[in-house]
Amino acid sequence: MNSSGDNAGFEWWRRTMQYKTGIGLTPEEKTRYEDDSKARELKKECLKCYEYRDWMLKYSPTVRFMVQAITKLNKGSDSKFDDSKIICDYCPDWKGGGFHPELGILLCQNRLRDKWHLEDTLSHELIHYFDDLKWQIDWLNLKHHACSEIRASSLSGECRFWEEFKRRGFRTGFHVARGHQDCVRRRAIISVSGNPNCQSKEHAAKIVDEVWDSCFADTRPFDEIYR
């Protein structure tokens, strides 16, 4: 096991220079440096993720509103939201986060581009949290799953015009007037496609379309699409 001194200050600088130049570097030292470098990066990502999480819990209007709505549903307006239910961790899959009814919210520290991406992701998962408490969602029921995905993508801000434009620009198929709805539908289909009870992307699209009108129109706990 490496001492913490090997991974800090001058000693880390020395090891980095040795790794980059290869001078006097044994295969074992090379492997150890790469392992230590990865561990340092993971720790840095984790600390940054929690820093952003805490900032959003304190200052983001959307996140704060959702936390208040969840708290009222959960134990009453006087109870405190348990932020330990929102954890940061490394994710091998290409996703920004996830929600589990028993475990809470996962923020994928290695997939989040910046503070504002984390805000969208956290808002998305908090909407799933709200839905699960309010309607006791059966996440293996495709219609339940699709409805919550539609709401989460629509209300979280991840499909607002500017975010969708940054992703797609003026590519074929991008329509300014219905960009928000196209984004919500696309992301909902992708999420439902990953459900173990979903047979194919076409199956997911069919389910999303079946529940679209009622679920897209349901903006609770907001009065309207806020972001």
Curated annotation (Swiss-Prot):
Location of this chain's protein in the cell: Mitochondrion inner membrane
What GO CC annotations are associated with the protein? mitochondrial inner membrane; mitochondrial intermembrane space
Q: How does it sit in the membrane?
A: Peripheral membrane protein
Binding residues for a divalent metal cation: 124, 128
Going by the record, the broad EC class of this enzyme is: hydrolase
Q: Which UniProt keywords apply?
A: Hydrolase, Membrane, Metal-binding, Metalloprotease, Mitochondrion, Mitochondrion inner membrane, Protease
Q: Which GO terms describe its biological process?
A: mitochondrial protein processing; mitochondrial proton-transporting ATP synthase complex assembly
Q: Which family does it belong to?
A: Belongs to the peptidase M76 family.
How does the annotation summarize its subunit structure? Interacts with ATP6.
Q: What does this protein do?
A: Has a dual role in the assembly of mitochondrial ATPase. Acts as a protease that removes the N-terminal 10 residues of mitochondrial ATPase CF(0) subunit 6 (ATP6) at the intermembrane space side. Also involved in the correct assembly of the membrane-embedded ATPase CF(0) particle, probably mediating association of ATP6 with the subunit 9 ring.
Q: What is the name of this protein?
A: Mitochondrial inner membrane protease ATP23
